[in-house]
Amino acid sequence: MTFREWNNRKNNWLRAQKGEWAAKLLGRAPMSDAYNPQKVQKILLLRNDNKLGDALVSSVLLRGLKALFPTADIDVVAGKSNATILRNNPAVSTLYFATEGLASLISCGLKLRGKQYDLYLDLDEKPTLASLAFLKVLQPRWSFGFNRQQYPLYNLTTTMDLSVCHITARYEACLRFLGYQGKLDTSYEIKLSESAKVAAGQFLSTLQWGGGRLIVVNPLAASRHRSFSAEQIFGLATVFPNDTFVLLGQESKLRKWLNGRALLPRMVTFTSGIFESAVLAQQANVLLTPDTFWVHLACALHISTVAVYQGKEEFPYKGNIAVWRPLDPAVKMLLWPGEQKDVPVYMLAQVLQEKLN
């Protein structure tokens, strides 16, 4: 076990201990009548982790909630970053903002308490001290979470092993518990604006194709431990010398990643926003990424993609791979037991060539 893995386990354990302590301290949920879906008119979803990919995948849940409760208002507590994704979801009525900090969530809870929500949803694996305090202040009619038998503030719960099931299965289980019937659409959903399409089109018109293919690379993940190295991508460009490589990302982060390297002749950067970059990736022959947000985006838009994950080829999948792996056939998953920056260039080239063929 690496130090980083040990540290993550330690932090998860401490988080669980704080949550269990808070559950005992904060007491039970207010007395409520038996759950009745016909009485649900106001829903609040906690999505303040600020993760873009999680917000995108939440489109499955939000669409299902709107189908189950067509006249209800569905509000979301979000972070400043993932609001970019949630804001254009047609099922969302209003966004409210909070960090994962205790003070921020309590302040948000006090603000929203007067709305008297009928249904509160927190689908994280375990609640935190801050999220429990938020729930205590909010006092919704019904509050749902998985495996919350030891947390009396939740008056709706069901048991599920969240470490081995895909995130869409988690959302489906929640919706079924709440009363959803019939076939559930588990595809991801995102809307791309016309202005994004125009911006990407203008950029594409400036490229000198020369008969080659377009390979779009998102080299940077949320963590440096999951990002590609410049050496890898420059190495790939030499394997495919007749193709054009477009590097996606924020300008300052790409500059730091390049570390003074000059771009190769058939290599350019594209530093516009998420939606413009998504349109550009749609036009590519293949997208290469180590980042789960871009994997979810590729699934939503059916982009031909090679997604590099940390993990081992084993079945059944467990942990991060089990929960967040791509299910869309357009996305091929490459598993590597170490950090993504250590994947050999020849291995990346082989999988890219398979997709390009």
Give the label of every model feature segment.
Residues M1-N357:
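Catalytic machinery of carbohydrate-active enzymes
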